[in-house]
Amino acid sequence: MASVQEKLITCVCQDKPAKPTNKITIVGVGQVGMACAVSVLLKELADELALVDILEDKLKGEMMDLQHGSLFLKTPTIVADKDYSVTANSRIVVVTGGVRQQEGESRLNLVQRNVNIFKFIIPQIVKYSPDCIILVVSNPVDILTYVTWKLSGLPQHRIIGSGTNLDSARFRHLIAEKLGVHPTSCHGFILGEHGDSSVAVWSGVNVAGVSLQSLKPDIGTDEDCCKWKEVHKQVVDSAYEVIKLKGYTNWAIGFSVAEIVESITKNLGRVHPVSTMVKGMYGIETEVFLSLPCVLNGNGLTSVINQKLKDNEVGQLQKSAETLWSIQKDLKDL
């Protein structure tokens, strides 16, 4: 007896279903992972979304919750499993998994614990999606992007850290707020480490091509009576403030990740401040990943913009590299 489906539908092609062309995987379904997932779905970037985590009940619950909203989305397939086979044929894998810093724990110890987790995650990703681009979001993101590069064996252009893409967005928002314009009309970069040693590139900040430094030569320095330097401090402190208020950050990093994913999936060639290997640039001679303005397209991170930095900015960038290397050089089992 024919089923309802067989009575309803006449099949004209017996071929297997086509493989997804823009499958996105999110590793980790915590607050950040789910913000990334929702942002990717709302921007309609994936024809399949896969979620992976070790917490089976939460994983299944998040998958079902998203599937129940399928009517309002344009991603036809949403799947989840703790087994990484569910990630097969991913175009981009976003890694948000890892452990948080415990009270009194050293940064090196935190990184080493995350290295041990990545030693399981990364080979599984590469096994099932050998041609994928990996976007690392877990913190400390620059060091874990280096760890991912080492563990994956993939070329540098396919290993990207979310880096200071969000820091730069915060920077532009705060400057725009002071000037009374929209953040998209205010241009500027935070480079270097995603963290306390990040570098505010005041020499490049502009609105409609008008350099703020040309209007106020001491902008962003200790001599600046208007205290624009506080804007960078606010950028550095903002995550801590949000965490203090709500317990975690998730929405802004989710939006930031979706913007990066969009540049890749749509082959846009947009410039993002993301974490990449910087050895040989700006006098840095160690294998560290730092954020520089990078061109992202369908092949991944294809080039770096050679920004004309001032001497003090280059010095800060080098110091940022030294900060990361001081942690990185003592990592084991890579």
From Swiss-Prot:
A GO term for molecular function: L-lactate dehydrogenase activity
Entry's EC annotation: 1.1.1.27
Xref: InterPro entries: L-lactate/malate_DH (IPR001557), L-lactate_DH (IPR011304), L-lactate_DH_AS (IPR018177), Lactate/malate_DH_C (IPR022383), Lactate/malate_DH_N (IPR001236), Lactate_DH/Glyco_Ohase_4_C (IPR015955), NAD(P)-bd_dom_sf (IPR036291)
Keyword Oxidoreductase: yes
Nucleus is among the record's keywords: no
Gene3D superfamilies cross-referenced by the UniProt entry: Lactate dehydrogenase/glycoside hydrolase, family 4, C-terminal, NAD(P)-binding Rossmann-like Domain
Record localization: Cytoplasm
Active-site residue list: H194 (proton acceptor)
Pathway(s) served: Fermentation; pyruvate fermentation to lactate; (S)-lactate from pyruvate: step 1/1
Gene Ontology cellular component list: mitochondrion
Binding site for NAD(+): 30-58, 100, 139
Name of the top EC class for this enzyme: oxidoreductase
Keyword list, A-Z: Cytoplasm, NAD, Oxidoreductase
Function: Interconverts simultaneously and stereospecifically pyruvate and lactate with concomitant interconversion of NADH and NAD(+).
Assembly with partners or alone: Homotetramer.
Protein name: L-lactate dehydrogenase A chain
Species the sequence originates in: Xenopus laevis (African clawed frog)
Lineage, top ranks: Eukaryota, Metazoa, Chordata, Craniata, Vertebrata
Gene label: ldha
